[in-house]
């Protein structure tokens, strides 16, 4: 009887797992089942104001499941940090009519559960002398977050830092040019990010032109099953990856390291100073250094005390060999549906192996790279019922352009609402 009961419990778990829908086509890793705002209201950003009706902040700060779409392009000059404190939100940057959205002056902070953020730019800069991350977040109890195709740069602290979150994916993000000798209270601080969490996947991201923290693995309780795979690191200064203390458990697999003009060494990892971190390191490529590529362990400090022979549990992704990951990342990473001139130049310099900005590619101010690009603005398609789906698209798929409620219906697919089908389809046509 006990065995029969156990069988049906197991069957229920399997059925539930099979029934779960991934966040969107291409979502991978531990955060792939994040639902975001699925089934909730559609909120349309209609202006570039910092606050008020139609602003991005107004949409973010509302409660309940919600999907945020954009009827405008351009740069939003924030007047204070923009905090996602309320659960269940999808931010669909790919919905903007042309070049998309950039957040300026203050950070975007993800402190909620069940969050999907896609295809936006976060470029803080030094205008307000703000000692902060660009895109940050992570708190104990936070679950289910996926950050996808985000471009973040010009932070005075780290460009992208998120940890403490359970079931997290950061994928296809372009993290570039933190500000090194700027106004940070600790002095020079051109750092990429602090990455970690419990069941956290970081894959196919680009870390470019940071002096250190490429990345730093978080050294807080609960840093377990962190999978760092198929990422590209270019032109680090004095450190690539380090950290992972407080008994961290980290996989570093199949990443591609390309030294640039500022790179001072070919090390892959400096282990945590407290000696408690454990790391599985395998299959990483150091361009131009066959010794490190053949034997990753020779590029790890204190290798005999911290390396393990088998990987920690991880959620499989569509994994590439490192050289293929490098090519794909340069082609697809960041806010790639419509790249701005700055991202294009970063990727060109990575490909060429150069660093013409600042000192050997390490910068102290966004002024050294030309500042915020002007984003092209487009005209949104007519949307009579303001449900986020243009009339022409609703007509094509047999929906009612005078009924806003059909955005959250499952007319076209049993797993995704109609607005999700529209948003996911936009990327196929770019």
Give the role of each language-model region.
Residues 23-68:
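Acidic Gly/Asp/Thr-rich repetitive segments characteristic of extracellular carbohydrate-active
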Residues 1-20:
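Bacterial Sec-dependent N-terminal signal peptides
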Residues 107, 134-136, 159, 181-182, ...:
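Structural detector of coil-to-beta-strand junctions
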Residues 94-102, 120, 402-406:
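Extracellular beta-strand-rich, repetitive "passenger/adhesive" scaffolds
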């Amino acid at each position: 009887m006990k065995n029969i009961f156990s069988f049906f419990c197991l069957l229920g778990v399997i059925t539930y797992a099979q029934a779960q829908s991934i966040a969107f086509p291409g979502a991978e890793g531990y955060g792939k089942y994040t639902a975001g705002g699925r089934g909730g209201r559609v909120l349309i950003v209609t202006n570039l104001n910092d606050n008020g009706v139609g602003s991005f902040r107004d949409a973010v700060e509302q409660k309940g499941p919600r999907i945020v779409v954009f009827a405008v392009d351009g740069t939003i000059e924030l007047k204070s940090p923009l905090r996602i404190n309320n659960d269940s939100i999808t931010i669909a940057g790919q919905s903007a009519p042309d070049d998309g959205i950039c957040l300026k002056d203050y950070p975007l902070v993800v402190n909620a559960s069940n969050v999907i953020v896609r295809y936006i730019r976060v470029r803080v800069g030094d205008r307000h002398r703000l000692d902060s991350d660009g895109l940050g977040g992570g708190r104990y109890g936070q679950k289910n977050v996926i950050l996808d195709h985000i471009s973040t740069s010009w932070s005075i602290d780290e460009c992208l830092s998120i940890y403490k979150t359970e079931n997290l994916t950061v994928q296809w993000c372009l993290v570039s040019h933190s500000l090194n000798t700027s106004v940070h209270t600790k002095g020079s601080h051109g750092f990429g990010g602090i990455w970690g969490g419990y069941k956290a996947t970081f894959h196919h991201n680009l870390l470019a032109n940071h002096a250190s923290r490429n990345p730093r693995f978080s050294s807080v309780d609960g840093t377990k099953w962190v999978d760092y795979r198929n990422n590209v690191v270019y032109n680090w200064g004095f450190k690539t990856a380090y950290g992972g203390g407080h008994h961290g458990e980290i996989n570093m697999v199949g990443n591609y390291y390309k030294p640039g003009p500022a790179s001072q060494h070919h090390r892959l990892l400096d282990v945590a100073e407290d000696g408690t971190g454990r790391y599985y390191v395998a299959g990483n490529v150091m361009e131009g250094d066959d010794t490190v590529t053949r034997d990753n362990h020779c590029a790890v400090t204190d290798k005999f005390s911290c390396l393990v022979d088998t990987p920690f549990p991880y959620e499989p992704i569509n994994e590439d060999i490192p050289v293929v990951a490098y090519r794909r990342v340069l082609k697809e990473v960041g806010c790639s549906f419509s790249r701005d001139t700055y991202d294009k130049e970063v990727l060109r310099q990575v490909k060429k192996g150069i660093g013409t900005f600042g000192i050997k590619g390490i910068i102290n101010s966004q002024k050294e790279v030309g500042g915020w690009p002007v984003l092209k603005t487009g005209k949104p398609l007519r949307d009579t019922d303001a449900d986020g789906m243009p009339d022409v698209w609703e007509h094509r798929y047999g929906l009612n352009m005078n009924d806003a409620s059909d955005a959250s219906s499952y007319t076209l697919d049993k797993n995704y609402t109609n607005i999700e089908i529209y948003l996911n389809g936009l990327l196929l046509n770019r």
